[in-house]
Amino acid sequence: MSTEGGFGGTSSSDAQQSLQSFWPRVMEEIRNLTVKDFRVQELPLARIKKIMKLDEDVKMISAEAPVLFAKAAQIFITELTLRAWIHTEDNKRRTLQRNDIAMAITKFDQFDFLIDIVPRDELKPPKRQEDVRQSVTPAEPVQYYFTLAQQPAAVQVQGQQQGQQTTSSTTTIQPGQIIIAQPQQGQTTPVTMQVGEGQQVQIVQAQPQGQAQQAQSGTGQTMQVMQQIITNTGEIQQIPVQLNAGQLQYIRLAQPVSGTQVVQGQIQTLATNAQQITQTEVQQGQQQFSQFTDGQQLYQIQQVTMPAGQDLAQPMFIQSANQPSDGQAPQVTGD
C-alpha cells in the first residue's frame, strides 16, 4: 500500500495529517505486537474463517492465517476511510457518504479492484419534458338532439324500446325547404335534419305504449337537449345542454288532445335591412301527413338564418298547438 499522502498546499486538514502519519504509526504497532495481541482482534475471526472457507481448494486453515487477515483488513479499512474523509471535508460536509468512498477509490490506483464493487453514483440527467402536441380537431357538424318523451326514462336515443330496435331517418335539406317527418306508432324514431352550414337537428318523439301511458302523457312530458361531440379518438359523446329561463320561453308544450300529430319544419330568412322577415310557406306538394290515434300533438320547428347563410345564436322554437277539426295544419309566422 502507498506510504505517501500525496496532498499539496500549505494548510492541511486533520484527515490529511492523519493520513500522512498513518503508515509510520501502523508499522510501529506491527513491530510491537505480542502473543497476547493475537488473542483479541477488532474484527471477529469467525467471519474471516467463513470467508476463507468459501474457497473449495482450502482444506485446512492455520491458526495464524485468520489473525493476519483480520489485521490486514483493519489496516485497509482505516486507510480507505481516511482518504474518503478528505473528500468529505473538501465538500464542506461532516457526514461520510458512499460517494466519498467511491471518489477515494477512483483517485488512487491501489483501489482499482474496488471500482466495480463500489460504483460511483452519477447524477441522473434531468428528464426531457415531452413536447405537448395539441391536435386540432377538424370542424365537424354540430348535432342537437331534441327528445320529447312521455316519461323521463322512457326514451333513449339510439337505443331499444319495448324489445324493438329503433330506426333513424336522416334527411338533408337546404335553406328555404321544408321537411315533414312522422314516426310510426309504437316506436321511437329519431329524425335528423341538416340545415345550412352543416348543422343537424335531431328530433326524437316517443309514442305512447298502450292506454296506461296515454293516461299519463298529459303530465309526464319532458324535453331534453343534448349536444353530440366527436372526440380525437373518433368516439361520439353526448353532453346534455342546460336551458335557462330565457331559452325555455321558446319551448311550449300543450296537453295532448284528440286529433292528429304533425312535425313540421320551417326555415325563415332575414331580409337585407334586418327589419323585414319573409316566411317560406308550406307548399301543398311538400307536406306529408300521417294519421294516428287520439292523444297526440302538433309541433312546429323554426330556425332563422341570416342572408349570408349564418345562423342566429338563438335556440329552436318549438310550439305545440291543436290541429283544427278540418285536418289542416295551422300556419305559424315568425316573430
From Swiss-Prot:
GO terms for cellular component: CCAAT-binding factor complex. Keywords: Activator, DNA-binding, Nucleus, Transcription, Transcription regulation. Pfam families: Histone (PF00125). One of its GO terms (molecular function) is RNA polymerase II cis-regulatory region sequence-specific DNA binding. The keyword Transcription applies. SUPFAM superfamilies: Histone-fold. The keyword Transcription applies. It comes from the Eukaryota. It is found in: Nucleus. Its main location: nucleus. Belongs to the NFYC/HAP5 subunit family. Component of the sequence-specific heterotrimeric transcription factor (NF-Y) which specifically recognizes a 5'-CCAAT-3' box motif found in the promoters of its target genes. NF-Y can function as both an activator and a repressor, depending on its interacting cofactors. Heterotrimeric transcription factor composed of three components, NF-YA, NF-YB and NF-YC. NF-YB and NF-YC must interact and dimerize for NF-YA association and DNA binding. This is Nuclear transcription factor Y subunit gamma. It comes from Pongo abelii (Sumatran orangutan).
